[in-house]
Structure formats: structure tokens, C-alpha cells
Amino acid sequence: MASTAKPVVYVVDDDAAVLGSLRFLLETDGFAVRTFKNGTALLNAAGKSSADCYVIDYKMPDINGIDLATRLRKTDVSAPVILITGYPDENISTRAAAAGVKDVILKPLLDENLIKQIRRAIKGRPS
């Protein structure tokens, strides 16, 4: 990523309202955003281009966020993954960490917390 380029965040959620809100929030804060309505669409795109960070919903109809993160690791090892979920379950957090997920954030999302976690994840990403 060039120093003048906007960091690119890929957001995956099956809820169109969440996608729209996250797109607005992230673009307003200076990120370039691509949204995907399911994990399959992201996997199809991930092989063609890469993100600086992925924000992935845990519960989606085609693939859960942890399995999606595991599959992403095969194509884009260095980009951090942040999992968002409405299910406060320690088992999800443990499984997410084992899959290489950088952080798990509970919905409803606290806007500034999400932005802070994305910036921290991108900053810590290997070059």
C-alpha cells in the first residue's frame, strides 16, 4: 500500500443495512471500501485483488465468518481479519483466534471502536 493510498477494507455481511452503514462509516473516515453480501462473493474477489483489512460477519447463510477467515488465510495471509458478531460467546472468540482472526467485535458496533481496531490491525500488518 502506497503511503498516499487509502487503506482498503473489505466488508462482508449478509445484512444490507449493516453493509451500508459500515461503508458510510469507513469511507467517511478515509478508507476505501468494498462490500460483499456473502462469503462466496468475497472468496471469488479475494483471488483477484487484496485488502488491507477484512471485516467479516460471523453468521452468514453460505459460510460462517471463522471458516471464511480460515479460507482467506490460504490466499491473503498477511491481511488482518476482524470478526463482527451479535453472539457474545467465548467459544466463538477462541475459535476465531485459532483461525487467525485479529479481533472479535460485538454488534451493535461502536463506531469509534471499530475504526480504532481496523487502524490498529492495519498498522500491525507485516509489509
For each predicted feature, which ranges?
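Two-component/phosphorelay signaling modules centered on CheY-like receiver
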Residues: 16-34
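The feature encodes the CheY-like receiver
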Residues: 19, 61, 89
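Alpha4 helix (beta4-alpha4-beta5 surface) of REC/receiver domains from two-component response regulators
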Residues: 67, 88-103
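C-terminal output helix
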Residues: 91, 109-118
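Short amphipathic alpha-helix used as the core "switch/output" element in two-component signaling
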Residues: 66-77
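Active-site beta3 strand of CheY-like receiver
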Residues: 50-55, 60
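Acidic catalytic/metal-coordinating carboxylates
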Residues: 37-38, 64-67
